[in-house]
Amino acid sequence: MAGIDLQSLGISLPPGYSLQTAAARPDMYETLFDPEHPMSSLWPQFITSTPVSEKYWSQLTDIPLFASYQLMILHRDVENKHESVVACGNSVPVYCPLNDLPDGGWEAILQTGIENYRAGHKQHPNLLSALGVTVASAHRQQGLADIVIQTLRALANQAHFEALVVPLRPTKKSEHPMVPLEEYVHWKLDEHARPDDQVSYDPWLRKHLSYGGQMVRIAPRSMTIAAHADQWKDWTGCDLAALAESGSDTSSKGLVEMPIPRALVPVQYDPVSKVASYVEPNVWVVHPIH
């Protein structure tokens, strides 16, 4: 694959903002790992702590080619000229048949992209998979998420990939943890909308559909993690043992199902081992390019 060229994409940004990659500005990308960075807490800690994430995430910048696909939007303060990262978009080139996107969603596509590269790209990447788009709260009225989506689509086109694919984590699903994702993704912003109306209830899904993305299937096991109740308390502040004793539903296997903050579905807690498992579904969205 040839190197990418951001300048040729023709992406317009608001005054004071610039588009960069981790390859071009590793110094700025490193600031995202500071626990005090305003964007460091925007993803739930249990999501960033999955075994797959911990093993593979750093390799997105360790591999020079992939570092070019880690986008940043920088903002320069007018008064003190200080530059900071206010949005980012992570992605990985990957080989995967477009009609066979994995049930393992986010974790599977990240792992496949890295391992295929390490194997010498025996199968040339045919897709660009988005892995996440994050925008600092103070800059969310500037259309930066739109810019990142447009840039990812343009990069996929520049590299002659078949599509940009997204194991999408619906923004508002955590407010409805007991609703199956298969049902949630078909909710409409207007409850009286026609069945074919694409105005989705979920804002992040709605945005992708507005750019031509198409929902193709659910990824039922997009992120998976199992940890002791003490670890879950550190991550979420929830005392799962106490919640389990308070009368939450118990399955035939003796597991207690309970919602936790920022999770899309309930965790499954085992009162005997005090281990809770979380298996998060996402929805595959495809942005066709060619």
UniProtKB/Swiss-Prot annotation:
Function in brief: Arginine N-acetyltransferase; part of the cluster that mediates the biosynthesis of a highly modified cyclo-arginine-tryptophan dipeptide (cRW). Within the pathway, avaD catalyzes the N-acetylation of the guanidine group. The first step of the pathway is perfornmed by the arginine-containing cyclodipeptide synthase (RCPDS) avaA that acts as the scaffold-generating enzyme and is responsible for formation of the cyclo-Arg-Trp (cRW) diketopiperazine.
Family to which this protein belongs: Belongs to the acetyltransferase family. GCN5 subfamily.
Superkingdom: Eukaryota
Taxonomic source organism: Aspergillus versicolor
Signal peptide start and end residues: none
Gene: avaD
Pathway per the UniProt entry: Secondary metabolite metabolism
Enzyme class: transferase
Catalytic activity, EC: 2.3.1.-
Protein name per UniProt: Arginine N-acetyltransferase avaD
